């Protein structure tokens, strides 16, 4: 019964008639636009919804999607993957991370390759599983390779808190959490007219944690409307409609479409936990985008005893590594190209043999185009 009720709930947000009604409303309002608009979705979940339900086909020619760096696996630069690989190859280490990381290629191979060579690499759904792994392997160091935007950062913070509270001696952290607003600012700059970002569909799960307040600056300082939008197709179409209406009415505002989950302030308890254990890095390098100031997190200095980057500093590679010369993942992550613009898309680069990270992750734009490409 519970599953049926849940299905009925989802059905409301996937209702074809409602989607069609929003498509008609968008088309009607779009006739009043003074120029075409490009809307960037900053969330990989949005990209997959857009592709899965063929939403580009429902939009008029003067309303266009630009795909952003909304996938935490995709934006991880190769040198960070190399860190994971090197750590995994240590005899006394069990490397633990989230599942999408398994096939992401570094310069020496992926974690899947490391596992094939005998490394103990484990993939979990929750960081808290590290506690059990550490308890069952007291002679090994369990290193949690933490990834994700604001959405998953609180879960890592909870694990840090438990490790300290329980005095677990054999869990370390390699922190790769990144934050969304800083890279949005970076993406606005230095764009040609064709790829200009006119508005953002704000990510939903990120905003549950951080609140919509983190986007205040975009309408005020950059004249870019932001509508925080849910994952379902009805959500996406309503969010697009709200953006188009802002342009028609010559407004530039922060709005929340996803009001059933998101509010302005966000989860204050989660934010406090993040603040307690993490601080901003001066610089974090994003794949394809480059160095973005204050966009990455690290453990606070007082927790250096748990920081794998410090403890293993002497063996971790320092060189920045660029993508394969035929891979345009970086250009796609900046919203300056789409997957089908890549010459190796669907041929040399497929989910079974990924060349770039955008084809690896379940949230990657290339994976979405490969899976649902016939719909657009």
What are these regions (language model features)?
Residues 238-331:
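Internal helical hairpin/lid segments
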Residues 2-139, 153, 157, 161-166, ...:
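Metallocofactor- and cofactor-centric catalytic cores in central/energy metabolism, strongly enriched
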Residues 124, 145, 229-230:
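Active-site-adjacent beta-strand anchor residues
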């Amino acid at each position: 019964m519970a599953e049926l009720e849940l299905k009925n709930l989802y059905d409301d947000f996937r209702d074809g008639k409602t989607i069609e009604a929003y498509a008609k409303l968008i088309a009607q309002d779009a006739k009043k636009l003074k120029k075409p608009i490009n809307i960037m979705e900053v969330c990989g979940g949005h990209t997959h919804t857009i592709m899965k339900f063929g939403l580009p086909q429902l939009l008029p020619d003067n309303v266009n999607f630009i795909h952003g760096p909304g996938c935490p696996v995709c934006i991880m630069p190769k040198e960070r993957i190399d860190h994971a690989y090197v750590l995994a190859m240590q005899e006394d280490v069990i490397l633990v991370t989230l599942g999408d990381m398994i096939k992401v290629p570094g310069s020496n191979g992926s974690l899947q390759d490391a596992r094939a060579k005998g490394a103990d690499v484990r993939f979990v759904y929750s960081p808290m599983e590290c506690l059990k792994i550490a308890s069952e392997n007291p002679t090994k160091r369990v290193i949690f390779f933490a990834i994700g935007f604001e959405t998953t950062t609180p879960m890592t913070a909870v694990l840090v808190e438990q490790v300290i509270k329980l005095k677990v001696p054999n869990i370390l952290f390699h922190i790769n959490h990144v934050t969304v607003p800083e890279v949005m600012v970076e993406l606005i700059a230095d764009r040609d007219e064709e790829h200009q970002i006119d508005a953002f569909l704000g990510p939903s799960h990120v905003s549950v944690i951080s609140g919509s307040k983190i986007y205040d600056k975009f309408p005020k300082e950059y004249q870019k409307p932001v509508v925080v939008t849910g994952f379902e197709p009805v959500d996406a179409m309503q969010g697009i409609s709200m953006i188009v209406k802002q342009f028609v009415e010559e407004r530039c505002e922060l709005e929340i479409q996803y009001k059933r989950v998101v509010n302005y302030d966000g989860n204050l308890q989660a934010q406090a936990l993040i603040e307690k254990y993490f601080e901003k890095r001066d610089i974090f390098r994003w794949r394809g985008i480059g160095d973005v100031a204050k966009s990455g997190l690290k453990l606070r200095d007082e927790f250096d005893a748990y920081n794998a980057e410090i403890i293993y500093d002497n063996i971790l590679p320092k060189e920045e590594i660029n993508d394969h010369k035929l891979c345009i993942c970086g250009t796609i992550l900046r919203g300056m190209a789409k997957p089908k613009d890549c010459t190796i898309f669907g041929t040399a680069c497929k989910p079974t043999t990924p060349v770039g990270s955008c084809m690896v992750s379940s949230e990657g734009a290339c994976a979405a185009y490969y899976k649902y490409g016939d719909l657009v």
